[in-house]
C-alpha cells in the first residue's frame, strides 16, 4: 500500500480493522499488547531505544512504551496523516517519516516491524530490510511480525479488509530468507492463536510456536556486533 492509500484510511484505521476482524477485533489493544510483550520476552527489558517501523497511528507504540518504560520509543511511517494521529495519541514520542527524513543510522537497539512487509511489493522487500539494518545498532535486533498465509481465517480477513487490498502475504520461509540476508537469525515461530474472546488460553502460545496455524508469525534477527554504528545518541536516555 502506498502513502496516499494509508493517508486515505488514517482517520478510520481502527474502525476499519474492527469491521474487518468482526468478533476477533473487539479489543485491538489485545493484539498490540501481545506483540509488545513478545518483543520484551525476546530482547529483555533493559534496551535503551526501540523503533516501530511502520507505526501507523501509533497503537503499538503505546504498548511498547508500557513494556519498555526506561527506553526511548520512536515510530516511523510513510503516511503523514497516520503520523499526525500517532503524535496526538502519544505525546512526547518522536515520530518521523522516512520520505522526509533520512534513516537514523545505528540509532536503535531494536527495530520492530509489525505487519509491514505484506504491504511492500515483493521486489522492494530487500530494500526495506536494508533500511532497517542501517537503523539497528551493532548487536541490536530486528523483529518482524507478519500474517500467516496458511491460516484460512487470516486469508479471509485480509481478503475482506480495505487496508489490505494490495497486500501480498508472505510465508515464514520468505521472511526468514529476507532477515537472514543481513542479520543472524535468533528466533522465529507462530503466534496469535487465541483471539480476545479466549484470551485466558493465551498462556499456551509459547508451546504452540512451532505449529503453523497461528494467525501471525515472528522473526528476530541480530545485527553483527563487529559492525560500526555511524551516529545517534538514541540509546542514551537522559
Located regions from the model:
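Conserved class I S-adenosyl-L-methionine
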Residues: 1-43, 47-56
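Class I SAM-dependent methyltransferase SAM/SAH-binding core
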Residues: 57-101
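A conserved beta-strand element that flanks and buttresses the S-adenosyl-L-methionine
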Residues: 112
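A short glycine-rich, Lys/Arg-flanked "PGG" loop and its adjoining helix->strand segment in the class I
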Residues: 126-138
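Conserved beta-strand signature within the Rossmann-like core of class I S-adenosyl-L-methionine
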Residues: 139-146
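A C-terminal cap/extension of S-adenosyl-L-methionine-dependent methyltransferases
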Residues: 141, 186-238
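Acceptor-substrate binding/catalytic loop of class I
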Residues: 158-174
